[in-house]
Amino acid sequence: MCTVTYIPLGNSDFILTSSRDIPFSRERAEHPRIMEEDGVELCYPKDGKAGGTWIGVSEKKRLICLLNGGFEYHTSRTKYAKSRGLIVKELLKTNDLNEGFQKVDLENVEQFTLTIVDWHKELELIEFVWDGTKKHIKSMLQDPHIWSSSTLYDKSVKKLRRDWFSKWQKDNVILSLSTPLKTSSVEGSQKSILDFHHNAGMGDAFIDVMMNRGLGGTVSITSIKKENNQLSMYYEDVFTKEKSVIQIS
């Protein structure tokens, strides 16, 4: 997994959307719900196998989204110390994110990339990459971004997807970050990016954003929208067509 897009909307608002690409044989995830763990309120879809998650938000005013793999393709081993989805929950619950980065134990944890949005003070976009040996932490500009998992997509396909995303930006009005958005504008942006996650590509299911490689592909789409002080999570099961929206705050 997976494909992730980020759209800043101004006024510390944003939309982050994730397409989850996994083997079709993996246990189906539970739809997201709000729960309390270790005294912290979280909202996330629960992985059907390991009990972790690939995307979630917490009362710490933080969103974390997981992509399998670091900077480049790697060959997985049969066993690791901990599921990467549990790392997501651990960092969602920590009080101090920078301290959490330093303390999180990643020995014998498979490579991964985290896209993190934090608005505890001001809106921050952070990329955290574990390459299997070293932690890489990068503060990102508040611009539209797209990430594609290194375990599924090589550099040429990643570039193709960046090109598709650039075209999407040109075809859709991305308002100035200093301009307050009306509700209709935010909803329109979310509808449009969901359409991108459903339809972007070149008619090749092997590399299109809605991916299908026979034994695996896109199983769900999650879109988290922050509009003023309101936070919501949209979730869609690609196979059952079941959809749910949770108002988190």
Where are these predicted regions, by residue range?
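N-terminal nucleophile
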Residues: 1-249
